[in-house]
Amino acid sequence: MEGGKGEGKRMKEEAPSKKLPPKIYGGDAGTPTKAAHDEILSSLLRINNFDSISSIKDESLDIDLSACVTISSASLVNGNSLSSTDFWRVLDESAQNNTELNLSSDVCRDDLAATSSSTVPSTLTSDNHSSSEFSVTFLRPEPPNAFTNSPFKKTSSSGTSTPVKLSPEQLHQQHQLQMPQSQLLQRKPKLPAATAVRLKVFKEEPPEEKHPPEQVVTKVEVCESELLPPSFTIFQQAKSAESVADAASMPPPAASETKPLEVDPAPLHKCLDCNGLLLETPDEVAKHEAAAHRLRLTYRCSECQREFELLAGLKKHLKTHRTEGRKDTWKKCPDCGKCLKLGSMWMHRKIHSDNKKYQCDICGQKFVQKINLTHHARIHSSEKPYECPECQKRFQERSHLQRHQKYHAQTRSYRCEKCGKMYKTERCLKVHNLVHLEQRPFACTVCDKSFISNSKLKQHSNIHTGMRPFKCNYCPRDFTNFPNWLKHTRRRHKVDHKTGEHLENIPSYCSKKSTTNKAQKAAAAAAAAAAASSAVNPNELSASSELKAKANLTSTAAPAPAKQARKKKQPQQATLAALGITLPAGTALQQVHPVPLAQQHQQELTTVLVPLAPPAPKQTKAKRERKQLAPKQLQQKPQLLQQGQPQQSSLEPIPAVPQIKKEPVQTQGPFLDLHGLSLTSAEELIMEQALEMEECGLYDAPNANTEMGTSDNAISDSAAALHFQIKNELPDELLPDDDFLPCKPSDRLPCPSLESSPFSSPASMELTAVSCASSVAISTNALPVRSGNYYLPAFTLNAHGKLSSTGNGVQSVTTSLAQTPSVSMVNVPLLVRSNQMLPSVDTLLFTNQTGGSRFFAGKSATAATPHLT
């Protein structure tokens, strides 16, 4: 029981104790039955003039309150109840354990709150009245072993309580001295066979002057603190002063048994989540749930204002703000020098001991704990019991799965302080922080580069060693490191390297060539056409309009799909750039497509240069070199007119075309060694060198001859068949001397090579001076012998389809085999048989002649050596 200290003071309702009730000692003999309870309580009512026996039964708690008696001083106190069962249990424990029984106001309050007083509202009293002390005697039948040496509390003059042991006679005398005179007169004799127990109860008298409101008002306050969650405090006021006066003027207990006591109705609603908060109406319950239960309780750190959902998380976080760590937090292992926490050190020390009871049956490794052996056994069994729900990847350890699941998270909570990059895991951030280190301890022994990790150095060393361990699964390309292989697989083939699925929204390499889309290109083409039409005079406009009308009539008869028109467009700008031709600023190429055959006599295909407005300046980025365009795109020929139709001048006059100057490109010095390059790299190098040499004028384009076929400079089917037939019939030996043709050292002649090896290109064939001591008989028309480059001779096919080597009809070649010649220097491999199945680059570019006229007609063919060594 406790009393309020003032009118403004409010009393918090304590939460019910979660501890289990103490065990009742003494068994059935020491604990009174229900009938004994009723007899004791009825005796108390007759002797001490108590109020009544409460016959309330709280259904919410399922506790029968009929065994509880309301104790009051002068019948003025109402609202505090005490269970007789709990009272006898306390007495049994104190008697058998011989311990101190502390029945002060605080302990009484806790005991009452833990048992049955949680549903009974507390009372508020005024501080104008001082508390009065009175004594109550509880009677119970005397057990077989009477209580002896029961401890009680003796109040000193200073206000402190000192536990003492008093005899029953001393207790009786002290009780008579302290009891008021009015109570001594009303006191009745005790029952015989009973034990007297005196309790000191401090209770505050009810107010006399102030009249509280008639209705019970329930007030709820939220007490907030820094570390603890808000708790609801309940305050209730007494109903009215009239009820207190009625309680004082109640009839004696005998009459109260017949007349039931009017009790306040229990609250209709109770919140089970807020320490038993009592609410009257459903509206209050709804408002309370909307205001309180939807709020998220958080705990905020006072140092960094970080919020936590649990108090334990906040306490753990507060340890990080310590200026100095605890001395015993980390310990150093004396055996291996590893630093561990104090709680983990004792388990770590067992690793260095010989007491390892758990041994693996497969490899014989021993472990200290059984769980370590279980984890080790999964290595041999390849068991992975933990599966990722996102990607179905399995792991052997739970910690590995938890670390993997962070990669699926969309949030990147780890930020680099130097560059601001965000990462999903702390491990990724630590790896990234190595980039910002000034020290790069891993240096390459071949070049002067250094790296932050050994793995980066190993990837770099593959460049020097030539190792390309990462090979593409879809093409013959290989790479020195994994990032380049991954980028090639995803962008070039658009395939996921893990699952093999096709990727849709992955940019390809071609997207880097141009940043403009098709709509922008179409708009630019329309603007160019409009500018060109405005520059033409009115006569030309009328002529062009007539041509357009005729074209519309023919198009209605045989409409052509739009996709075919797109295919006819040729990248002329890229073709000119590949050939090294630069156009003046502000010019563009406009291609006029040929008209149908019925109108070919009126107009022919023309190319017009149209001035354009200067484009907006753009930042040029360094792009890596691409493969050159195909030969068909390099040299486009207009379609030949049908025989019998005379070529007529076009109706539209051709404007003057400005001179296009060819800028010579500096050629590389000595040719690179092609032995160390792959086939793809060698072909690219040969293509570039061949184009550069043609642009510089080192090779003269031969006269066009379409005897072999009517196609363009690309090799035809018959030429390809002839090419492979020659390869099969030529022996693997060195070519005889009469199969070579000399040339002047100042003239570089085209080389229609028939060999398809990477070394067969004219850019890579460079045969130097060949000395000879033999006598050569030359005709009168033959030129003197000069040392220079030598190539394959002309050839013809006989009637049986066999290859026969022939010389020019004007020339006569004789060779003396008396002396053996010698070669001074050859800096390229010999022309031998190759296993490659496709024609070489130079064959595609420069082979367009057949028969004997394909080699230097009008020159004498002479040879100097029968063999090359």
Swiss-Prot record:
InterPro entries documented for this protein: Zinc_finger, Znf_C2H2_sf, Znf_C2H2_type
ZnF C2H2-type span: 269-293, 299-321, 331-352, 358-380, 386-408, 414-436, 442-464, 470-493
Residues spanning the membrane: none
Region (Disordered): 1-32, 134-165, 554-573, 617-652
GO molecular function (one): RNA polymerase II cis-regulatory region sequence-specific DNA binding
Comp. bias intervals (Basic and acidic residues): 1-17
Bias type Polar residues, positions: 146-164
Major subcellular site: nucleus
SUPFAM superfamilies: beta-beta-alpha zinc fingers
Highest taxon above the source species: Eukaryota
Record flagged with keyword Ion transport: no
UniProt function note: May belong to a complex set of multifingered proteins which play an important role in gene activation or regulation at early embryonic stages through a maximal accumulation of their transcripts (or protein product) in the mature oocyte.
Protein name as annotated: Serendipity locus protein H-1
Species whose genome carries this gene: Drosophila melanogaster
Gene name linked to the record: wdn
